[in-house]
Amino acid sequence: NIIVTLFVTAAAAVPQTGAAQKAAYNTPGAGNPILPGYFADPTIKKFGDTYYIYATTDGSGAGFGPAQLWCSKDFKNWTLMPMNWPDSHWIWAPDVMQNEADGKYYYLYCQPCKLHLGVGDTPRGPWKNVLGESEAVLVPDRFVKNAITLDGQTFRDDDGSVYMYWGTWGIYKGFGCGAGKLNPDMKSFSETKLIPNTEVTHFFEAPFVFKRNGIYYFLYSCEHCEDASYRVDYATAKSPLGPYTYHGTILKTNADGTVHGPGHNSVLQEGDNYYIVYHRHDNPHSNRGFHRQVAIDKLEFNADGTIKEVIPTHEGLDLKPEMKVAKNLAFGAKVTASSYYDNDFRPEYAVDDNNGTLWRPRTTGPAWIQLDLGKKQSIKSIWTQFEYGTQFYQYLIETSNDGKHWQTFSDKRQNRLAGSPMVDFGNAKAQYIRLTYTGGQKNGFGGAIWNIKVYGSVEDSAPQQWLGLTAADFDGTTWHNNEGMLAGKFSLLQGTALRERMAGKDAITLQPGTQLVMTHPQLGKTRKHTLTAQAFDNGSWHQIDENDPRLNLSEGKLEILAGEKQFTLTNLRYYNWEQEAAEKAFDAQSSIVREAVADKNCQGLVVDISADYYNEGD
């Protein structure tokens, strides 16, 4: 491996609290993109005090990925959270709305070419299809004549009425956008119609409707999503279903092409302020436009209600300036690495607090990156944002005072939990930090990193599953927390435990008097949390929580105890937040998914080539 030492350039001196005016895409501290990863077709919502972004998982070439959402309370630190539904990995352009009539949340997503609608009790679900069967279709293709079904979005009017809009390839003569008014049952339509492309000129896909001062605004995307022609146009009307009047383009590729192909937007309203959230292509631009990232800019209006042209930025926006974040000790640190792919993926990009820049090693095998904090400092939390938050990564974090002698800070070399950020806790006083990537979930992806953030305080605000243990994680004496965020394990202090299959579940059985213990300073009763497990008692499985004496939670420690009777359990979960009743009920009936580790022997460079790239003689 080539060992490269790089020093952060003068650009890194930009204060962490805000990027310089007219920031470039690679300016340290730039606020756009707002998410660390490849996500497209974003719908942003605010429920209560929390922002949610629902988006297509990108970067795979076909929008394949698990059901997920991003959430944040401060609009600065975003956490990726898994959802139970859809159980397909083909989930495009998701949208969530809350229905005032029943208080429920409704989750809309599409597959080509159909729409599915789910219902749940929280913005996170758990979801189930409103029509019963998981794959039941609410809006099939050509449900409205000459409207190709894709990219569904909901709109709730002031009177509580709910409307739905959908469509793609609406450019043909006589085609356009499908639309309809939903019945109160949210399963059928009282009215449907075509909004023709003679009203929404150049309509291609991604309709989004919002209302301001009695005017209905219909925003949509035009041209080709894979190149610079992609843009956002809009039209207005006096009623939700039109007729609409076309007004032109409001968002397009910028002059230097670093905001490339912006489109498929949603709109967030905060008081009298409006913001447009959209995707754009990554920098440098990947082939075929399948590595999109989410950005935000302000949406402003003229006195007559027309929308001003949006000038897309790399600065982004701080919607919650009153909410301060802890100092990131890694920002602008001196960096060394085992290798880097080329100058577009330099190691210092891992310490620049910029979701649009990435350190990528030259190989997809083991790799390391080392940070020099400049002096010995207290280190209690390290957040790592790997390239693909929906895949798990395996890694080791170490600290050192001299760069030669290393102590383990967090060992996740057996990790099987996907997430972003990956959060690791410890208590070190050191100048150097080294993260070594050892493997992952998928072949050929490697250990690329958007950002490494280091804190001198315990930063535990990301809502995550801290413990996740299945029977497969038990080796006879140790129960490894491989599906949980906290690095650690349960140790057998006394007695005997064994793996066995019981009534359809793989489990571990503790013989009478057996004790398993895990210690970690983040465990405890005083902070918000949810602790559950599935236990086998009296011939059947049921859910238990910390009120069961066999789960003894105290500050810094969790004990699993078998008293006079044997204790059979599996799917032990501990969240650092309080679950809603519906979420607990779902966990009671479901098992932790244990993903396979990529075959190390198959790792190598990835080739993606098709006839589209053929030129005569080349």
Describe every region a protein language model picked out.
Residues 21-201, 211-257, 272-273, 279-323:
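Beta-rich carbohydrate-recognition and catalytic domains
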Residues 586-617:
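Substrate-binding cleft of secreted/luminal carbohydrate-active enzymes
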